[in-house]
Every structure is written in C-alpha cells, then in structure tokens.
C-alpha cells in the first residue's frame, strides 16, 4: 500500500469530538459518519480522537472504537490511519500513523515495526518540509492549517492555499495533503497548486448530508487528479 498519491485525494480526519452534535453515544456517532463518508468515496481515514470531548481519557473504549473504525475502513478497502498514538496504531495493526513535529520521531516509528506502515508528517513551514523531504521514513506531508480551523486546539498560523504552490516551487516532491478549514470551493485551487489531495473534518462531519457532501468533495478532487 505504497502508492501514496492514490490514497490522498479525499482524506477524512475525525474523532468522537467532531461528531458530538449528533447525539450522546459518541462511538455510534463517529461510526455512522464514517460509514456515510466511506459510501461517499473517501480515500483515507485518520482516527484523530483527542481533547476533552473525546474518548481520550477512556483508553479501552477508545481502542474498541478504533478497531471498529479500522474494520469498517477495511470493508471498503480504505486505509486506516491513527493520529499521534503510535502504540495504539501498532496494537490494532493500523495501516498508518500520522505525527506532528513534536511527536515521536519518524525514525523511531519506522524502527518499531517491520510492516509497511504509512507515515504522515505535519508541516507548517518551508524549512520543515525541506527537512522531511530528505527523510525516507515519511510517506506524505499534511500541510496546514490552510485556513482558520476550530477542529484543533491552539492551531499553528494559517498558511493560505498558495503555500502549496510555494512548496512545489521550492522543490518539494513528496505527496502533499492540504488540511485546515478546507471546503468544497477550495479543492480545485489546492489541487491546481500541487496538492495530491485535501483533508477535511467539518466539511464532512457537519454536512447536512454526509454521503452527498463526501461525493461532491471526491468528484472535485478527482477532476484535478494528476
């Protein structure tokens, strides 16, 4: 599963904290949204369950939910990525892990398993991208936040869509997925600027019709596939 560009066109990121508006059963909320998003055509799912409104403080429930999400993704042949939690990712045999600049070094992650784990790395500055470009352990960059976002506590400075173009013009060749406040109207420009895909949270979790919104996002991204 190393043709990374193929899994990035529509990268869905979510946890229970993103679906709490749907009802009291946090796990059922996320599974409902994930199934609709899979039906709509997401190409990758990142389990990012963190914060005071998540299951982060009940690890057993969080692990059980992660396994259910993983199994659902496998029914649809969609890669299942875990955010930050390397131990969880390895324990449940996730397809990949996504880490930030201050998380476990990617060399350590790669050394923990012989399996072909997908590793994504968050990037907010050009110098970070230049460092990551030379790290063979990294499969793709998550670039953001592109726009202001409410989905992450204490987000880093926003970059704007043109930052994707800046990275490509600077010689960055690794696959890129743009994240942070991305909506349907932004997909065309982000793809034209050189993103291999878009990562969304609210554009799916808060859609009136999750499956239809997902389908529209996927079609917009595929239209500009390389």
Swiss-Prot record:
Cofactor, free-text remark: Binds 1 Mg(2+) ion per subunit.
Gene3D superfamilies cross-referenced by the UniProt entry: Aldolase class I (3.20.20.70)
Catalytic reaction list: 2-[(2R,5Z)-2-carboxy-4-methylthiazol-5(2H)-ylidene]ethyl phosphate + 4-amino-2-methyl-5-(diphosphooxymethyl)pyrimidine + 2 H(+) = thiamine phosphate + CO2 + diphosphate; 2-(2-carboxy-4-methylthiazol-5-yl)ethyl phosphate + 4-amino-2-methyl-5-(diphosphooxymethyl)pyrimidine + 2 H(+) = thiamine phosphate + CO2 + diphosphate; 4-methyl-5-(2-phosphooxyethyl)-thiazole + 4-amino-2-methyl-5-(diphosphooxymethyl)pyrimidine + H(+) = thiamine phosphate + diphosphate
Record-listed Mg(2+) binding positions: 84, 103
InterPro entries tied to this protein: Aldolase_TIM, ThiamineP_synth_sf, ThiamineP_synth_TenI, TMP_synthase
Residues the entry annotates as binding 2-[(2R,5Z)-2-carboxy-4-methylthiazol-5(2H)-ylidene]ethyl phosphate: 149-151, 181, 201-202
EC number per UniProt: 2.5.1.3
Residues that, per the record, bind 4-amino-2-methyl-5-(diphosphooxymethyl)pyrimidine: 46-50, 83, 122, 152
GO cellular component: cytoplasm
Keywords: Magnesium, Metal-binding, Thiamine biosynthesis, Transferase
Gene Ontology molecular functions: magnesium ion binding; thiamine-phosphate diphosphorylase activity
UniProt pathway: Cofactor biosynthesis; thiamine diphosphate biosynthesis; thiamine phosphate from 4-amino-2-methyl-5-diphosphomethylpyrimidine and 4-methyl-5-(2-phosphoethyl)-thiazole: step 1/1
Domain of life: Bacteria
Cofactor(s) the protein requires to work: Mg(2+)
Any GO BP annotation: thiamine diphosphate biosynthetic process
Protein task: Condenses 4-methyl-5-(beta-hydroxyethyl)thiazole monophosphate (THZ-P) and 2-methyl-4-amino-5-hydroxymethyl pyrimidine pyrophosphate (HMP-PP) to form thiamine monophosphate (TMP).
HAMAP family: TMP_synthase
Family: Belongs to the thiamine-phosphate synthase family.
Cross-referenced NCBIfam families: thiE
Protein name: Thiamine-phosphate synthase
């Amino acid at each position: 599963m190393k043709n990374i560009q193929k899994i990035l066109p529509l990268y869905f990121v979510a946890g229970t904290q993103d679906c709490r508006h749907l009802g009291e059963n946090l796990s059922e909320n996320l599974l409902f949204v994930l199934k609709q998003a899979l039906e709509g055509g997401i190409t990758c799912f990142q389990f990012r369950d963190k914060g005071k409104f998540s299951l982060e403080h009940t690890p057993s429930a969080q692990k059980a939910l992660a396994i259910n999400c993983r199994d659902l993704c496998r029914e649809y042949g969609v890669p299942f990525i875990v955010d930050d939690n390397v131990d969880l990712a390895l324990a449940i045999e996730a397809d990949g892990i996504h880490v930030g600049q201050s998380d476990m070094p990617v060399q350590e992650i790669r050394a923990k398993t012989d399996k072909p784990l997908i590793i994504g790395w968050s990037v907010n500055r050009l110098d970070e991208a230049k460092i990551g470009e030379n790290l063979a352990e990294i499969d793709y960059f998550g670039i953001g936040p592109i726009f202001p976002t409410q989905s992450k506590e204490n987000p880093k400075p926003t970059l704007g869509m043109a930052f994707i173009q800046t990275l490509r013009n600077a010689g960055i060749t690794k696959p890129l997925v743009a994240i942070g406040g991305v909506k349907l109207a932004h997909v065309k420009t982000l793809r034209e600027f050189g993103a291999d895909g878009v990562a969304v949270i609210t554009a799916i979790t808060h859609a009136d019709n999750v499956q239809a919104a997902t389908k529209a996002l996927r079609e917009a991204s595929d239209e500009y596939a390389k």
